Design a protein with these regions (language model features):
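N-terminal cap/lid segment of alpha/beta-hydrolase-fold proteins
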Residues: 21-64, 322
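The serine-hydrolase catalytic nucleophile loop
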Residues: 76-88, 102
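Catalytic nucleophile-loop/oxyanion-hole region of alpha/beta-hydrolase
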Residues: 79, 105-141, 323, 327-329
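Conserved alpha/beta-hydrolase
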Residues: 89-109
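Alpha/beta-hydrolase-fold enzymes
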Residues: 156-240
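Short beta-strand/loop motif that positions the catalytic acidic residue
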Residues: 278-279, 284-287
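Catalytic histidine neighborhood in serine/cysteine hydrolases
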Residues: 304-319
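Catalytic active-site module of serine/aspartate enzymes centered on a nucleophile-bearing elbow/loop
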Residues: 316-319, 323-342
Length: 342
């Protein structure tokens, strides 16, 4: 486990930075008085229940077909962290929005909890499109997707094989496959990767024999002098009143922490392969100019087909775009979806 912990310091992914920094309009738990919220549940193709919060404008005309957007949360988070904020802000602009909990997280089904399964995560986006397509007030030809952090890569993966997703946007995207294989800025060596995989397979056998589940560190539970700048960034969101949230029935100290034994599934996850086949459906990649994750949006943009846009937010880091309403380019997202879901 020591080898694994050392490697996690190199990987530093976004499932997860002493008081919460509430600057630049940080408002994760925003509540709009202009929209209605309804909890909904629907099946994915694996017959697992996916739970989401459905937001509709209070002044929406339900006798006509309206555009809709599926929104996915950061990896290791739940819909109450970042996704609900984006969903409400976009619903205020006239969209039907659906913020989902990915399978194995939050209120969605999946045992054991916190298991990594990018294939199922991606199917959750398609299942959300299934659900929205059956609502009488939603136009099934005008459904877009928005993935935040790790969900950006799941949304891209889903869109490659689901042409019903007419417009695809990502914010502070992580390529969850690349960051596990290579670390940030390709800082992980092949030998370190092999040691990482070995730790996971050894733990898998422990669990098969009835042993306790082990989790990868995710966001640290407390800071010390050795805590990295990236982890401090996540700590300020996930471990403070700014964005901390513990789903019912879970332990606070385990939030953001995926199962160690399942990390091999990210090693085999290549969401940007064939990304160009999404064209001619439009793609928008939003990242901050200070974001440690910027490399992933730049890579996706380079490999995607037209039409595409890389939108860089000045002065914004990775986690800033989770909840800092003075930095999040809601106007850009609104114009992108209005133009491409009309």
């Amino acid at each position: 486990m020591r080898v694994f912990t050392m490697l996690l310091g190199l990987l530093i992914s976004s499932f997860s930075a002493i008081g919460a920094d509430m600057s630049d309009g940080a408002d994760n738990f925003y509540k709009s008085d202009k929209v209605t919220q309804q909890k909904v549940t629907f099946k994915n193709q694996y017959q697992m229940n996916v739970t989401g919060n459905l937001f509709t404008p209070k002044d929406m005309n339900r006798s006509v077909k309206n555009p809709a957007i599926v929104i996915g949360h950061p990896m290791g988070a739940v819909k109450e962290q970042s996704s609900n904020l984006y969903a409400q802000k976009l619903a205020e602009q006239g969209f039907v929005t659906l913020a989902i909990d990915l399978s194995f997280w939050g209120e969605s089904e999946g045992k054991p909890g916190h298991l990594i399964s990018p294939e199922i995560y991606s199917d959750d986006f398609s299942a959300a499109v299934d659900y929205l397509s059956t609502q009488l007030y939603v136009d099934p030809e005008k459904i877009g997707v928005l993935g935040i952090c790790g969900s950006g890569s799941f949304a891209v993966s889903a869109a490659k094989i689901d042409p019903r997703m007419k417009a695809i946007a990502t914010v502070s995207m992580y390529d969850m496959g690349s960051v596990f294989r290579n670390g940030l800025n390709h800082s992980v060596t092949p030998e370190q990767r092999k040691a990482f995989i070995k730790s996971a397979t050894e733990q898998r056998l422990v669990e098969f024999k009835g042993g306790d589940i082990a989790y990868i560190p995710g966001t640290v539970n407390k800071l010390d002098d050795s805590t990295s700048a990236v982890q401090r960034e996540f700590f300020d969101f996930y471990r403070t009143s700014r964005g901390g949230y513990t789903p019912q029935g879970e332990k606070e100290e385990l939030t953001t922490k995926p199962m160690l034994s399942s990390i091999g599934k990210f090693m085999n996850f290549y969401p940007f392969n064939d990304i160009e086949t999404i064209s001619p459906r439009p793609m928008l990649f939003i990242t901050g100019d200070q974001a440690h994750s910027k490399e992933f949006s730049e890579d996706a943009y380079k490999r995607a087909g037209q039409p595409k846009e890389l939108y860089i937010v000045p002065g914004a880091g990775h986690v800033d775009l989770y909840d800092r309403t003075d930095l999040i380019p809601f106007a850009k997202l609104t114009s992108f979806f209005k133009e491409n879901l009309k």
